[in-house]
């Protein structure tokens, strides 16, 4: 039982490190990051939970969600998603793209 718990803890800790490393890489690349509950705070959010790290566009307020443009998938060269993918690749991260979000796992990114 202890071995299972230790393995789960190691995965959780690895995903936490991965989420922080992904956030840092995106910030270093100049990607517009989300700022919680602030007008004009919409941006890319890195969510760490369970066995995945997810990267997606997050609107800071409901008003922005209804009225702001959708830079995540803009027609002009793919929008912010293209920036995020390039930054992740440049930083050496392996990820999957489900068409909406990017997903990363510690198992595929043990270098963090």
What are these regions (language model features)?
Residues 23, 67, 71-73, 85:
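Functional cation/ligand-contacting sites centered on basic and imidazole/sulfhydryl donors
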Residues 17-18, 83:
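Generic hydrophobic/packing signal
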Residues 48, 57-59, 71-81:
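A signal for specific C-terminal beta-sheet/loop modules enriched in small/flexible residues
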Residues 75-112:
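Short, compact, well-ordered microdomains
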Residues 18-66:
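An N-terminal amphipathic alpha-helical segment
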Residues 1-8:
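N-terminal, Lys/Arg- and Ser/Thr-rich interaction peptides
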């Amino acid at each position: 039982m202890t071995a299972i718990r230790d393995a789960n803890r190691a995965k959780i800790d690895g995903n936490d490190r991965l989420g922080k490393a992904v956030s840092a890489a995106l910030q270093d690349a100049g990607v517009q990051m989300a700022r919680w509950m602030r007008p004009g705070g919409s941006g890319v959010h890195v969510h760490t939970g369970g066995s995945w790290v997810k990267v997606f566009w997050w609107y800071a307020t409901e008003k922005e969600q209804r009225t702001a443009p959708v830079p995540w998938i803009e027609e002009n060269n793919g929008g912010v998603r293209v920036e995020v993918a390039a930054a992740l690749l440049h930083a050496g991260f392996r990820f999957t793209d489900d068409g909406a979000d990017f997903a990363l796992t510690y198992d595929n990114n043990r270098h963090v």
